[in-house]
Amino acid sequence: MEKTYLPTVSTADKKWYVVDAENQRLGRLATQIAMILRGKNKPTYTPFMNTGDFVIVINAEKVTVTGNKGEQKLYRRHSGRPGGMKTETFNHLQERIPERIIEKAVKGMLPKNALGRQLFRSLKVYAGPDHPHAAQKPEVLSIQTIPGAKS
């Protein structure tokens, strides 16, 4: 009887991908990124191990949402002090810290445990078109999040 194959940390083949977020829909882009971070696109996927790849997201400042979400979608954070709840809209946060929008969307789609925190560290988000990871030789990954558009 053969044993079931289990990948190990040493056999894990981690690749680096670059994703351009320009004119992409936020939620659809985040689901694809979360799948790559978890490694669900690989035949060696194991639920309790980090078998995923690294993802670099560029042009985070140009990600879009549909409808009135720009004015209506709220991002909340709390300082921990009484009355310390801060709320801001998608448009305001996109002007201030555009990286945080994609980070928050992807983080919510990862497991809420130690593995999820480890997977989240494999995500690198940059507001502009430049990134400092050229030494890793990342592959360009085209993700099409606009329904009906040609890739």
Curated annotation (Swiss-Prot):
Question: SUPFAM superfamilies attached here?
Answer: Ribosomal protein L13
Q: Which GO terms describe its cellular component?
A: cytosolic large ribosomal subunit
From the Swiss-Prot or TrEMBL record, what is one GO molecular function term? structural constituent of ribosome
Fetch the Pfam families from UniProt: Ribosomal_L13
Question: Its Gene Ontology biological processes?
Answer: negative regulation of translation; translation
Q: What InterPro entries does this protein's entry cite?
A: Ribosomal_uL13 (IPR005822), Ribosomal_uL13_bac-type (IPR005823), Ribosomal_uL13_CS (IPR023563), Ribosomal_uL13_sf (IPR036899)
Tell me the domain of life: Bacteria
Q: Which family does it belong to?
A: Belongs to the universal ribosomal protein uL13 family.
Main function: This protein is one of the early assembly proteins of the 50S ribosomal subunit, although it is not seen to bind rRNA by itself. It is important during the early stages of 50S assembly.
The record's note on quaternary structure and interaction partners says: Part of the 50S ribosomal subunit.
HAMAP family from the UniProt entry:
Ribosomal_uL13
Please state what the protein is called. Large ribosomal subunit protein uL13
Tell me the organism. Acaryochloris marina (strain MBIC 11017)
Q: Which gene encodes it?
A: rplM
